[in-house]
Amino acid sequence: MSAIGVYLAAYKQMGLQAYTIGDRDLGLGLKTLRSVARKASFPLLSSNVVHKDSGAKVFKGHTIIRKAGFKIAVIGATTSLFVNRNQLEESDNIRVIAPEESVAKEIKAAKAKGAQLFVLLGHLNESEVERTVRSNPEIQFVLGGQWVKMDSRAKKVGNAWVVGAYMRGKNLSVMDLYVQNKSLEFVDRNARQQLIRQQRTLESRIKGRERSIESARKDPKRKSSVEYLERNLVQLKTELQEVSLDLEDLVDPASDASYIKWDLRGMDTGFSDEKRVAKLVTAHRAIYPDPTKKPRNGKAPKPALKTSRTPKPTVRPKPGTPVR
């Protein structure tokens, strides 16, 4: 709980306005998550985690954020595809249902509140995202967080611009919206440049893979890797073909259209520009030393005693997918 407090305090400082519950968060148990929800300065969202008996939502399904004169509905959804799902559902008497219908209910409720833009903040895999946005055309943007592949550009799925933060919390997915002429139809002005960059990267990787295959065939010690390298080469060529077709079909947007800008930023593990967060972490480590680091004598460090002088951290779950 002490580590959760550090996260909560840091997120409050960052001005976080919504947080979607992920499958690993559920592993903390409902009692802990309810405690976190009470102490957090932002809502914990999930439209599709429900009580098994009543079918009622366990957490809030959406929140309305006001920005630049617009009402933006941010809807949370949690993946229903994870290893210990049955165990979690039994222990807390909950169900994690498919997100399509639960998201539709949140859209209806948000519309009644005057929402104009709809964002899905999804702890979902790509197949779940695709099913959800295709069955809910009102969704215009998806910020995802359980991608297997790293995105190089925003993709249009149905009516929604979809981006992902890849996995393991190592990247921050940042999407900015620019409204022009009061239009809420958005284009990606950087699509052509991003496709060209992706095309060149794939061409370079294909050449490198072909050299690796040729080298492996000549080396008896590496012959066993040839089949794997060849499969990977086929995959790269398929991706290149898809990108080339996207480039051929791309229509450059009008200059006065509303547009998006998206960036995937690697997380900085240092604290040089976040002194207040560093102070919280230092206070936490004074009580709970990092178990992955051992002193020179090889012995694991003992937890320090908690004193009245030690700053008391607040509370929060592991980082998820923030909305900006």
In which residue ranges do the predicted regions lie?
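Acidic, metal/ion-coordinating pockets
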Residues: M1-R324
